[in-house]
Amino acid sequence: MKGIVLMLCLVAGVHSWSFWRGSPRVEPHEDVDQACRQAAAQGNCEFYRCLERRFPCGHDGYATKIGLHFCARADELHSQFTPQGKLFMNGSKTCVTSTLLPVYESYSARCDDIEDAGADAMRTCSYNEYAGMSSCTFIRSNMDVYNQMLGTDEVSRLMGLGNARLLFRIFVDGARCGATVASERFTSLGGSIMGSVGDLADGVSNWWRNL
């Protein structure tokens, strides 16, 4: 558990460097669409395409890299969840898209702000109960498919957000619910980042000495 917390601090610290730049404000590229509002109300993955079309942030933006990817991944694995687990996932997806609807409807937005709003929505919605299930009950009764949903690629995408509170919720609280496989992937990837940061620091140090 201590290793996971250490990785949280490292990932959040590395990610915070990017905030020195900030992101420019993006003006809406298309009008608010009633069909997109309906998609948000239904937890439909199409909502993330709507969000990206209105406020384009590219392949590395939240709507495409996180929102759409994880929504589509959940749909792909839908048949493998328990009947109650399917209801839980539907409720969780709808909570996130509904929470992000005001962002979609806003007159302008920064990509960083969309990312923060998305991460906060994912974390906040994870505390709710859906179909009478808590997140811990959901994880324990759908462990195999949950571990599939959080593969190495998915863990890497979440780490890219650098949102320590969301990462804590998924990987620390998740481990307490028995999701140790996903937490081990997080720790392993975090170790790789630590090694990369160490190599970078050594390179800078050598460059400085040779000046």
Q: Where are the regions that the model predicts?
A:
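Mature extracellular/luminal domains of secreted and GPI-anchored eukaryotic proteins, especially small
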Residues: 15-208
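Cleavable N-terminal signal peptides of Sec/SRP-targeted secreted and luminal proteins
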Residues: 1-16
